[in-house]
């Protein structure tokens, strides 16, 4: 069910998903930004984001002090019951995979402490380790769900095949399955692994991942799409005719993941359509995500709330099926 409320600048839309009591804002604010990673006071920025109607915030155990920064805001504003919190655990450290029951419990408990909350609306396993049976992790996530400590749960950077494996275990043991997933997805295809090391990042972007997208559509599992603007490549700061300039502007991870000819061609098409529709490139890129035939919530980060306000206008852009196909 979709709910709409008038935001200050644009009409923000909200969507209910399974096992989460509150509706999610269709655009999610990503808290892996310098001010929050460093644990500084981000209250003013978060106030402005919230004022735009964005009520869903994505953080993680390994985003430095991001959880503590978000928790500081929640405590000061007393608005925990009005927002949806997504957090993640089991990220590898120093090349050591951490997809184990012990690490999962440790990271969940640490997130509660840092966030200053006794429950997390959506909990994700940040990375996967395909050598590990998913069953024990499914058991632990169910324990926390049953205790009312986490709502929906799933994987970030888990392939759809591994999610299916986890859900088969859940089905065979009368347990709740993964009902949400957070891979990379966007018009900017993640061709390289931005971070590398260990079990890699999972994307469902680009022509080679049509099967994965069909699986999400058929299984009706919502996607929380990280790096939805290609870590800045489709944020309006890079021009399609200046590849060398892009490599200077974007961070090394973005260059490694996204700076490929195919994406500059997509960027040129997005620039053209943005001009025709009198809007911005990031608005077109986000509208492309929001106009897909499966349920997807783009994650967007920004150091300034004005950029988030501008990006939120993507919610008002309707793209024809032909435009969606042409952009890609």
Range-by-range predicted roles:
Residues 30-40, 89-103, 131:
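Active-site mouth loops of central-metabolism enzymes
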Residues 37-49, 99-114, 164-168:
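Short, acidic/polar
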Residues 112-133:
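Active-site groove signature of glycoside hydrolases
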Residues 22-27, 53-55, 79-83, 117-121, ...:
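Short, well-ordered coil/turn segments that N-cap beta-strands
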Residues 132-328:
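Beta/alpha (TIM)-barrel catalytic core signal, keyed to glycine-rich beta->alpha loops juxtaposed to Asp/Glu
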Residues 81-94, 181-185:
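A short, structured active-site edge motif that brings together acidic residues
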Residues 3-84, 146:
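N-terminal binding-site loop/beta-alpha segment at the start of enzyme catalytic domains
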Residues 29, 59, 87, 122-125, ...:
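Conserved beta-strand positions
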């Amino acid at each position: 069910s979709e709910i709409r409320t008038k935001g200050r600048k644009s009409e923000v839309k909200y969507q209910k998903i399974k096992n989460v009591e509150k509706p999610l804002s269709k655009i999610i604010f990503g808290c892996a930004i310098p001010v929050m990673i460093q644990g500084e006071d981000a209250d003013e920025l978060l106030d402005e984001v919230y004022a735009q109607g964005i009520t869903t915030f994505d953080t993680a155990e390994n985003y430095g002090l991001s959880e503590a920064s978000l928790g500081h805001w929640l405590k000061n504003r007393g608005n925990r019951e009005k927002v949806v919190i997504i957090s993640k655990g089991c990220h590898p450290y120093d090349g050591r995979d951490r997809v184990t029951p012990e690490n999962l419990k440790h990271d969940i408990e640490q997130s509660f402490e840092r966030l200053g909350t006794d429950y997390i609306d959506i909990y994700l396993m940040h990375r996967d380790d395909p050598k590990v049976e998913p069953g024990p992790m499914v058991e632990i996530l169910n324990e926390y769900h049953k205790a009312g400590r986490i709502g929906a749960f799933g994987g970030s950077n888990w392939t759809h095949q591994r999610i299916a494996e986890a859900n088969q275990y859940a089905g065979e043991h009368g347990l709740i399955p993964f009902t949400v997933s957070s891979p990379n997805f966007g018009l900017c295809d993640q061709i390289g692994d931005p971070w590398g090391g260990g079990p890699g990042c999972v994307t469902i972007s680009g022509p080679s991942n049509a099967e994965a997208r069909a699986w999400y559509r058929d299984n009706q599992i919502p996607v929380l799409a990280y790096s939805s603007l290609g870590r800045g490549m489709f944020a309006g700061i890079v021009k399609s005719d200046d590849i060398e300039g892009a490599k200077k502007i974007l961070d090394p991870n973005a260059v490694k993941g996204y700076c490929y000819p195919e994406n500059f061609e997509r960027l040129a098409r997005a620039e053209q359509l943005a001009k025709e529709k009198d809007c911005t490139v990031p608005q077109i890129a986000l509208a492309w995500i929001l106009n897909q035939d499966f349920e997807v919530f783009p994650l967007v980060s920004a150091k300034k709330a004005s950029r988030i306000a501008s990006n939120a206008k993507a919610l008002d852009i309707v793209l024809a099926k032909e435009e969606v196909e042409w952009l890609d």
